[in-house]
Amino acid sequence: MTKLTRRNVNTLIGTLIAGGIAPNSAYTRNYGSGGTRLAMTNIRMLIGQEMSGPGAILIENGTISAVLNETDNTAAALQNAQIVDYQGRYLIPAFTSNHAHVGLIKGTTGGRHNFTPENAYAALRQFQAYGIGTVVSLGLTPTPEPKTREHMRNNPQYGASFMTAGAGIFAPDGLSPRPQIPEEARQVVRQMAQQPIDIIKLWIDTFGPIQPMSEDCFRAAIDEAHQLGFAVAAHVYTLDHAKKLVAAGADILAHGVRDVEIDQEFIDALREKGTWYIPTVHMDEATYIFADQPLLLENPFLQSALSPELKDQFSSAEWREKTATSERAQKARQDVEMNLRNLSKLIEAGGVKFGFGADAGAFPERIPGFAEHRELEHLVNAGLPPVQAIGVATEQAAALLKLTDRGKIAEGQRADLIVLDANPLDDITNTRKIHAVWQQGELVSLGTP
């Protein structure tokens, strides 16, 4: 994917014209100014559950100011607007990832020691190029300096909009607080609330010799977070922990249940409490998929996301053999199977709120951008129609974060948009046929490689 900057946007106008898009020179000169009135015309738009159009949308100051269908007086409405004719292509909202990690990966290594502003910007730009407009870094994330955080949060030139849970509580790397009694848990939450975070993250799991956070502690942490106005997302693996977390009032289960098949009691609890459920199926699949399917490396959609170091690793026959036969890979295959089984059961039951994410960026093989599109495919394979899977990744994912200004193509919404060369309602993998990505009304990425 070609990532646009002020320096190279003029170079790419030839590519735009070759692709059937001819923004005039005035728009090019005003690129990034935030003041240009822009019209995308002759484009089919995902409105609700249907792909409508072709029609047009107007964008002003980074937001959608009008959505026009074929019967509207488009000539009058488009007067004085800079026109981008998309020649019958398809428009969907940009995705929101409720569960990712930003700035932790460098080559084939991962960890907080890799976090720098430059590395964080690179990760956010990669998410953005793949159509993810908003990213929640759900734990393990150092607190950026105020200027860096402002760039990461509100400036499309630095990539997807950034939200964060900060370091989190009871993280497996041992670098975040591990409260042992309820009052400690409350104090830790109060301390975290003083930082520029958007959500509280808890890890409730067994990591080697580390015993999980006690129920008394996570109940206290959840209660304190709610008193301070924060939602709580919980890492979870077992059904037992998931049930206890839902009962304690956790707002979000940040992973699918993978140890056993879920039961009706759990389904009823999710519905009753309104708890969000983020399956993150690809998280475990990423452990082995690049070893099992070496032909993936020939896919340009993946190649664009790989660092040279990671590409070399995936290309190694020795690495593939060692990885594919490892105990970790075998366990991951079992977890994916159970996760999909439970996801299908929840979809069939209905009434459960799904969030979206793939835990991309936590480990090198969980590749930002590619991971989210693969996760969409898992949602469909588990039983969601493509239009509903896209709804999970857009409107529902925004709703999980209480972001009412994005996730839909509608007047007043942020112009965070993906232009596609094929209809994703026909085949969910058509979300990978990216023609352009817009964020807050700015063209930020052009084309599928």
Where are these regions (language model features)?
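Alpha-helical scaffold segments that flank or form the walls of functional sites
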Residues: T109-Y158, P179-D198
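Active-site gating/metal-coordination segments in enzymes
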Residues: A167, D173-D223, I252, R258
